[in-house]
């Protein structure tokens, strides 16, 4: 029965090679480039180094745990496991209570006046008292037999053997990092001793200054905080969460500031474009339709009662009044000046009433305005000046147009000419009457004056006598009376002016 087995196995195994022969050959794997191969090799080396470091750390942790157990015993190892649980913050309430207890113990040790050996003795005494109380309670409750059985069968049972070396693992990892740091520092010392000396001196100086300003108690408390808080941040990834939130806020802030700046730039450019377009449209519109501001017009029309204002027409249809001047009106004294100048310039062609009379008086021979007329006019001007000043200071007066000015000037010129003529005639008549009254009745001189002059000025009584002697008619007397009336009317008119 043993002989047919090989053929059966051979028969059963025959189809397999046939299937393998019938199956198509698998394609060869793609060949990687040299750079990729080198990168893969480096990654494999790094992974192997990490695995080796992990194994070394685990081995060192095991050795440290064994050494601590051998030196301090199981109670110390149990305390180490409890401390590991507290520092890992697996149970937040217990970790918080341990943190508060550690702070209280630290500040008690820092502020108490007792020395270190006093504190150690107190701690040992407290431990002994606790153990005695525990024994008494257990002996009374369970009895001596139970206590003996418990003491005889006492064994250390660890339900979680994997968590025991955790604190020792951290200690071992820290020790390995410290040993690596020492090796690197020794290598740095061999390569550059000067830099190493400078670095060590700088570090020592820094810690000296820090210790002079910050007490050692504060530094120790900071170490305690780091021992409790660093595992909390590391286990819960609090630092990574805070960093991600801060990064998102910074990104939003950066984006918001950039968008705000770009928006302000766009608004400013649009405002500049609108302003330039508006300025161009306003210039075109102002060229077609000039605007007259009320404030500018009021300022131009603001005048005072000092001098004559100068009115000038501008290109846009407005007029300008020089500030501090008074425009000419019908009540202004300056309107008489050009009329008097024109009258005195053209009065030289007016025929003389004396007609060659031999008088050398400048007032009588001058054909200008008489002194009496000037005196009366000065009196009238002195009376009218306050009223004119009050009128000019009372409000603003606008200049007259060309037609009104022409009519006003013509009327004033006519009135002035009429008044001047009447005053001249009256003065001449009064002068003739005074000369006749003062002159002596000498016939020879009269005949001489009659021969030398064209006419003779006689007194009124003499005129009446001559008229009666010559036998004038009543019509001539009526004409003489009309002349008297006209002269009286002219004198009254002159007195009114």
UniProtKB/Swiss-Prot annotation:
The chain crosses the membrane at residues 60-80, 96-116, 119-139, 209-229. Residues 319-330, 471-490 have a biased composition (Polar residues). Changing residue 149 to A: Reduces self-association. Residues 1-51, 319-365, 377-396, 436-455, 468-497 are annotated as: Disordered. Residues 1-59, 117-118, 230-497 are cytoplasmic. A motif (LIR motif) lies at residues 453-458. The keyword Cytoplasm does not apply. InterPro entries: RETR1_RHD, RETREG1/3. The modification Phosphoserine is found at residues 149, 151, 153. Residues 81-95, 140-208 are lumenal. Keywords: Autophagy, Endoplasmic reticulum, Golgi apparatus, Membrane, Neurodegeneration, Neuropathy, Phosphoprotein, Transmembrane, Transmembrane helix. Changing residue 151 to A: Abolishes phosphorylation and reduces self-association. It is found in: Golgi apparatus, cis-Golgi network membrane; Endoplasmic reticulum membrane. Residues 84-233 are annotated as: Reticulon homology domain. Residues 13-23 have a biased composition (Low complexity). Phosphorylation at Ser-151 by CAMK2B enhances oligomerization and membrane scission and reticulophagy activity. One of its GO terms (cellular component) is endoplasmic reticulum membrane. Residues 443-455 have a biased composition (Acidic residues). Changing residue 456 to R: Severely impaired binding to GABARAP. The keyword Membrane applies. Residues 334-348, 377-388 have a biased composition (Basic and acidic residues). It is linked to Neuropathy, hereditary sensory and autonomic, 2B: A form of hereditary sensory and autonomic neuropathy, a genetically and clinically heterogeneous group of disorders characterized by degeneration of dorsal root and autonomic ganglion cells, and by sensory and/or autonomic abnormalities. HSAN2B is an autosomal recessive disorder characterized by impairment of pain, temperature and touch sensation. Onset occurs in the first or second decade, with impaired nociception and progressive mutilating ulceration of the hands and feet with osteomyelitis and acroosteolysis. The LIR motif interacts with ATG8 family proteins and is necessary to target the ER fragments to autophagosomes for subsequent lysosomal degradation. The reticulon homology domain provides capacity to bend the membrane and promotes ER scission. It is required for homooligomerization. This domain does not show relevant similarities with reticulon domains, preventing any domain predictions within the protein sequence. This is Reticulophagy regulator 1. It comes from Homo sapiens (Human).
């Amino acid at each position: 029965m043993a002989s047919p087995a090989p053929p059966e196995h051979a028969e059963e195994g025959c189809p397999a090679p046939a299937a393998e022969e019938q199956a198509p050959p698998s394609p060869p794997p793609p060949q990687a480039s040299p750079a990729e191969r080198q990168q893969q090799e480096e990654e494999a080396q790094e992974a192997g180094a990490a695995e080796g470091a992990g194994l070394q750390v685990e081995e060192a942790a095991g050795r440290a745990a064994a050494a601590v157990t051998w030196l301090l015993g199981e109670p110390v190892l149990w305390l180490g496991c409890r401390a590991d649980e507290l520092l890992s913050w697996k149970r937040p309430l217990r970790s918080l209570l341990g943190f508060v207890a550690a702070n209280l113990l630290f500040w008690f040790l820092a502020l108490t006046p007792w020395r270190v050996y006093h504190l150690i003795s107190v701690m040992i005494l407290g431990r002994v008292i606790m153990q005695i109380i525990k024994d008494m309670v257990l002996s009374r409750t369970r009895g001596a037999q139970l206590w003996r059985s418990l003491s005889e069968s006492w064994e250390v049972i660890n339900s979680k053997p994997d968590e025991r070396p955790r604190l020792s693992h951290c200690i071992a990892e820290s020790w390995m990092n410290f040993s690596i740091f020492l090796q690197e520092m020794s290598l740095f010392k061999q390569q550059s001793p000067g830099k190493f000396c400078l670095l060590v001196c700088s570090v020592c100086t820094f810690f000296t200054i820090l210790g002079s300003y910050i007490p050692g108690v504060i530094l120790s408390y900071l170490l305690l905080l780091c021992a409790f808080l660093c595992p909390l941040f590391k286990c819960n990834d609090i630092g990574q969460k805070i960093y991600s939130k801060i990064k998102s806020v910074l990104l939003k802030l950066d984006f918001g500031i950039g968008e705000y700046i770009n928006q302000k730039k766009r608004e400013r450019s649009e405002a500049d474009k609108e302003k330039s377009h508006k300025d161009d449209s306003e210039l075109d519109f102002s060229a077609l339709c000039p605007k007259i501001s009320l404030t500018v017009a009021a300022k131009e029309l603001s005048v005072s009662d000092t001098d004559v204002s100068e009115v000038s027409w501008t290109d846009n249809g407005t007029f300008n009044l020089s500030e501090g001047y008074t425009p000419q009106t019908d009540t202004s004294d300056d309107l008489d000046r050009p009329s008097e100048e024109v009258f005195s310039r053209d009065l030289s062609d007016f025929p003389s009433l004396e007609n060659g009379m031999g008088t050398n008086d400048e007032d009588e021979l001058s054909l200008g305005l008489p002194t009496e007329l000037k005196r009366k006019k000065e009196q009238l001007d002195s009376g009218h000046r306050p009223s004119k000043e009050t009128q000019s200071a009372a409000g603003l007066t606008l200049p007259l147009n060309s037609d009104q000015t022409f009519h006003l000037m013509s009327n004033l010129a006519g009135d002035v000419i009429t008044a001047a003529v009447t005053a001249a005639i009256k003065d001449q008549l009064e002068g003739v009457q005074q000369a006749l009254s003062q002159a002596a009745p000498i016939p020879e001189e009269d005949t001489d004056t009659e021969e030398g002059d064209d006419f003779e000025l006689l007194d009124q009584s003499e005129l009446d006598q001559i008229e009666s002697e010559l036998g004038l008619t009543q019509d001539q007397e009526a004409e003489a009376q009309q002349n008297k009336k006209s002269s009286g009317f002219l004198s009254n008119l002159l007195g009114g002016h």
